[in-house]
A protein has these predicted regions:
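Sec-dependent bacterial lipoprotein signal peptides
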Residues: 1-14
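Non-catalytic macromolecular-recognition regions in eukaryotic signaling proteins
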Residues: 14-160
Length: 160
């Protein structure tokens, strides 16, 4: 009995601390092509580097000068993953009026995510923003390094 008391006192002096660490993800280097056509639909290409893995990514196709928290419901869209680490590339198909017809992306080690559509209000200059999710936890908003402007030239052919 005395031995159990000694063991109990020893164990009560010891503590075990478990810390749950969010594995996280990091989106960096988000860029888009610089123009879209005003005479027809354009696939606005984008690319970014992903560290970690995403379960979902949100897209914000908003007027230049606004932030994602100001985006209206129709200006945002989410694609479910998984989206694997590495260089991620994709496109948003937009009309001259600013409507997003589809979003698609591919990441290393996964099949492309099927195009899905959303409609946005027509505004000329826009910027793409992203936010990734891992394990249901939202990461920070990531702003594209450049904004996208309309091109009304008759030979419009946006290059990546």
């Amino acid at each position: 009995m005395r031995g159990l008391v000694v063991v109990f006192l020893f164990l009560s002096a010891c503590t075990l601390t478990l810390e749950v660490v969010y594995p996280g993800h990091r989106i960096a280097g988000l860029r888009t092509q610089e123009t879209y056509c005003t005479a027809g639909n354009t696939r606005v290409d984008f690319a970014f580097d992903l560290e970690g893995r995403l379960d979902k990514v949100e897209f914000f196709w908003i007027p230049e000068g606004l932030t994602p928290d100001q985006a209206r419901l129709e200006e945002r869209y989410a694609l479910s993953g998984p989206i694997h680490a590495g260089r991620v590339k994709g496109w948003l198909e937009v009309t001259p009026e600013g409507e997003v017809l589809a979003v698609s992306l591919t990441s290393p080690g996964s099949l492309s995510l099927r195009p899905q559509g959303v409609i946005v209000e027509p505004l000329p200059d826009r910027r793409l923003w992203l936010r990734g999710y891992t394990g249901g936890l939202a990461g920070p908003f990531v702003r594209a390094a450049n904004w996208v402007r309309p091109d009304s030239s008759p030979s419009c052919d946006p290059a990546w």
